[in-house]
Amino acid sequence: MGFNNLVSLAVLIEKVFPIRYTPAGIPVLDIILKHESWQEENGQQCLVQLEIPARILGRQAEEWQYRQGVYVHVEGFLAQKSRRSLMPMLRIQNIQEYKG
């Protein structure tokens, strides 16, 4: 069964945690993203505000480790936060500074 799991958001990098490395030497950067926008739902305007944990792997992790407070556009997919937690975490595959 092949369901789509694609997320695209304009967000603020609210918090950046210290970079870490897997045993294989792959950089891992965990961040908290903050989003706020007005969306239409059932014909009414609805204010959407959320924070979501996210993870960047590889070279991009090293590039973004000092970018707290920057607005970005991210694309990725939702996955479980850990083996023990089914809470969602955005796994970022593409990240670019948001130019508005």
Curated annotation (Swiss-Prot):
Keywords: DNA replication, DNA-binding, Primosome. Belongs to the PriB family. Residues 1-99 form the SSB domain. It comes from the Bacteria. One of its GO terms (biological process) is DNA replication, synthesis of primer. One of its GO terms (cellular component) is primosome complex. This is Replication restart protein PriB. The keyword DNA-binding applies. Involved in the restart of stalled replication forks, which reloads the replicative helicase on sites other than the origin of replication; the PriA-PriB pathway is the major replication restart pathway. During primosome assembly it facilitates complex formation between PriA and DnaT on DNA; stabilizes PriA on DNA. Stimulates the DNA unwinding activity of PriA helicase. The lineage of its organism: Bacteria, Pseudomonadati, Pseudomonadota, Betaproteobacteria, Neisseriales. GO terms for molecular function: single-stranded DNA binding. The keyword DNA-binding applies. Homodimer. Interacts with PriA and DnaT. Component of the replication restart primosome. Primosome assembly occurs via a 'hand-off' mechanism. PriA binds to replication forks, subsequently PriB then DnaT bind; DnaT then displaces ssDNA to generate the helicase loading substrate.
